[in-house]
Amino acid sequence: MIQHAGLGYRRDLAEDFLSLSENSPICFIEAAPENWLKMGGWARKQFDRVAERLPLALHGLSMSLGGQAPLDTDLIDGIKEMMRRYDCTFFSDHLSYCHDGGHLYDLLPLPFTEEMVHHTARRIREVQDRLGCRIAVENTSYYLHSPLAEMNEVEFLNAVAREADCGIHLDVNNIYVNAVNHGLLSPEAFLENVDAERVCYIHIAGHDVETPELLIDTHGAAVLPTVWDLLELAYAKLPTIPPTLLERDFNFPPFSELEAEVAKIADYQTRAGKECRRAA
């Protein structure tokens, strides 16, 4: 089971992961199953060696939980086998859609409507039934707000999770990015109203500032102070401290800087003075 603070596994960082010291703050890794289901060769051997040392969380990119196309059962079965192979007990994916007659290669927003709540929750239940375990859904960054919305973002997230009986994967950077870009829901209001009992996993990441009113969720920069403050607030609001992962996808600094950010997560967890829960 995963617990405490972790770092997303990227092939560019393989040698660094293989060289982790015993006192490294990195307690688990996360990988996108789509990147590994058909991967072999040296890259897979490195991944396997790291996954033998550290617990693994799986975070999907293409389940298209809110999409209209039929669910990809081959993908779900592949994820189930990967979870079995690596003794992985946690899987999450985005509350979005990414298929429309083919892969769209982006995570597109869903309209916050009752109809979409029922549609998405039904599909999540199908995924859970096929996987044989509970999953978690992540709040995504979005750049176009649907005029069809009947509720705000956190109400939609709560409603889907409640109807599907799934966990909530909270991305604090996405909360901040959406608050700045749309001005519809403050980060504080989001955290005050999220179903805290369902929050079982957290992401934190950096973003790019295009203009003061436009932030882009890139995972290509260090976490900014405003987002660290939001993580601290999240820990204060939640009954227990979920496993929390630092996402970094490119523009990699020296690995010691990434470890320092993971250590900062661990420090915030300790200062919160609450039980650290396991995600399963």
From Swiss-Prot:
SUPFAM superfamilies: Xylose isomerase-like. InterPro entries: MbnB/TglH/ChrH, Xyl_isomerase-like_sf. Transmembrane segments: none annotated. HAMAP family: UPF0276 (MF_00697). Belongs to the UPF0276 family. This is UPF0276 protein NMB2142. It comes from Neisseria meningitidis serogroup B (strain ATCC BAA-335 / MC58).
